[in-house]
């Protein structure tokens, strides 16, 4: 067989079924084994007939093993890059970045300390998807790399060679070359042999000795905020770059803020504002995103601290005040996660259209979770829904919501429901926020029925503003 063929790894193993795509019947081992052998025979036959060569591009990383290098790049700039070197358990880790302070913050969260060392690093771009050479693989020298790249993109090959020779002129001991392709980012390290270079200078050898330099494949691991937010929602926009305020960091808002950050909020120049004047008490912990270490802390400040711990580069502003005294500035999206009806009405009046407003709340003792987004003057606001509910319209359940209170005395009473209900409300809010940023605001009113003993009264819909609403008919 050639040095590199599709579906055969470096260890000689044959990949005939993608991992995780087939469920084998453990109660039919003989039949399943025969089916696997039949599939493996079919794949191997196609390989021997010279087919499936195109699969080499999709499987490139299976043929490209090497030292891990972490890349935290938000810009598209090519050329020389900044590389931080970290010592961890006696080994060196490399982090390529376009923002040293941002990446250093991430490294501090891991307990890593940046050294004063650096590595000459270059970034080049190609139009070709990588695929291994079937004649000679893996590449061991610069000559092998250049021969390989000439079959993919001759222009990129020239750029790579120029950067390697530039590192030689700068008397570097080694350099990292990263190649941005349409499919992925991959790279390799070049090791400069100073003995050959000194001999070349002494005897005025005109040959280009860079072809003999040893290389080592580099496995690129992306840790940039854009990749982390978008990997699980490909082909969709994230919340990166948006100014978003979450009012209420309680049982809904805490989980919601966490999910929003995972969806890109507070990155790429955007900001996440958390507003809550309340503190965390023991009775809150059972259904709150925060825990015992945050006891008696302000919810907005503690949640901000927790999110920075999880995502060190996130831009968060905590406002431990009543939202009625807060200055939120220009917003792309306002989210009311307080579940307080009167405050929700005030927010609708104080932040009218064109500021998009998303309200998320829990109905009854966890009977249902609902969310309403207002993006147009013709659409209903949160106050409109109150008028409709009074007339028996747009309700969540056919039956009246049960009134269940727990606790002792007037000050200790509360509506009981588990944390799972809070998470479902936060999930619905995140879903609608992502739909909003992707231009989908319908249905504007969404309900997720949790209590299966109840009957859903209102399917997801787009309610118009209510004629009785004093805010929409002012």
Give residue ranges: language-model regions.
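Compact alpha/beta protein-protein interaction domains typified by the UBC
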Residues: 1-20
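Ser/Thr/Pro-rich, low-complexity mucin-like regions
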Residues: 35-53
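Short, glycine/acidic-rich hinge or "gate" loops at secondary-structure transitions
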Residues: 51-63
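Glycine-rich phosphate/adenylate-binding loop
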Residues: 67-211, 330-333, 337-474
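Glycine-rich adenosine-cofactor-binding loop
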Residues: 235-269, 273-281
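A structured beta-alpha segment of the ubiquitous adenosine-cofactor-binding alpha/beta core
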Residues: 302-330, 338-342
């Amino acid at each position: 067989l050639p040095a590199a063929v599709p579906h055969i790894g470096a260890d000689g193993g044959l990949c005939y079924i993608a991992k995780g795509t087939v469920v084998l019947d453990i109660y039919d081992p003989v039949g399943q084994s025969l089916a696997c052998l039949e599939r493996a025979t079919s794949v191997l036959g196609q390989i021997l007939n010279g087919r499936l060569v195109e699969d080499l591009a999709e499987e490139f990383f299976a043929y490209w093993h090497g030292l891990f290098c972490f890349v935290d790049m938000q810009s598209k700039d090519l050329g020389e890059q900044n590389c931080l070197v970290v010592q961890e358990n006696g080994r060196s880790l490399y982090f390529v970045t376009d923002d040293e302070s941002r990446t250093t913050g991430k490294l501090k969260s891991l307990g890593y300390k940046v050294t004063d060392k650096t590595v000459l690093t270059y970034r080049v771009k190609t139009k070709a998807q990588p695929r291994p050479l079937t004649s000679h693989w893996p590449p061991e020298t610069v000559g092998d790399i250049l021969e390989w790249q000439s079959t993919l993109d001759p222009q990129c090959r020239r750029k790579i060679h120029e950067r390697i020779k530039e590192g030689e002129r700068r008397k570097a001991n080694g350099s990292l070359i990263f190649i941005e392709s349409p499919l992925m980012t991959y790279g390799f390290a070049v090791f400069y042999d100073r003995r050959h270079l000194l001999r070349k200078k002494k005897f005025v050898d005109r040959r280009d000795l860079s072809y003999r330099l040893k290389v080592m494949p580099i496995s690129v691991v992306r840790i940039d905020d854009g990749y982390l937010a978008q990997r699980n929602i490909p082909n969709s926009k994230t919340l990166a770059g948006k100014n978003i305020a979450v009012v209420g960091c309680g049982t809904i808002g805490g989980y919601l803020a966490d999910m929003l950050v995972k969806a890109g909020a507070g990155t790429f120049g955007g900001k996440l504002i958390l507003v809550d004047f309340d503190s965390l008490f023991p009775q809150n912990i059972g259904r709150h995103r925060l825990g015992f270490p945050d006891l008696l802390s302000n919810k907005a400040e503690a949640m901000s601290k927790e999110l920075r711990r999880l995502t060190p580069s996130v831009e968060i502003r905590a406002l431990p005040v009543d939202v009625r005294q807060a200055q939120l500035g220009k917003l792309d999206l306002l989210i009311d996660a307080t579940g307080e009806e009167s405050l929700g009405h005030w927010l609708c009046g104080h932040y009218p259209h064109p500021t998009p407003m998303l309200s998320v709340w829990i109905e009854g003792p966890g009977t249902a979770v609902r969310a309403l987004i207002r993006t147009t003057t013709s659409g209903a606001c949160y106050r409109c829904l109150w008028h409709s509910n009074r007339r028996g319209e747009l309700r969540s359940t056919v039956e009246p919501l049960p009134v269940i209170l727990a606790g002792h005395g007037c000050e200790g009473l509360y509506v009981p429901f588990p944390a799972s209900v809070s998470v479902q409300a936060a999930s619905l809010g995140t879903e609608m926020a992502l739909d909003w940023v992707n231009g989908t605001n319908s249905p504007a009113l969404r309900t997720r029925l949790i209590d299966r003993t109840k009957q859903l009264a209102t399917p997801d819909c787009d309610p118009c503003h209510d004629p009785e609403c004093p805010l929409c008919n002012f």
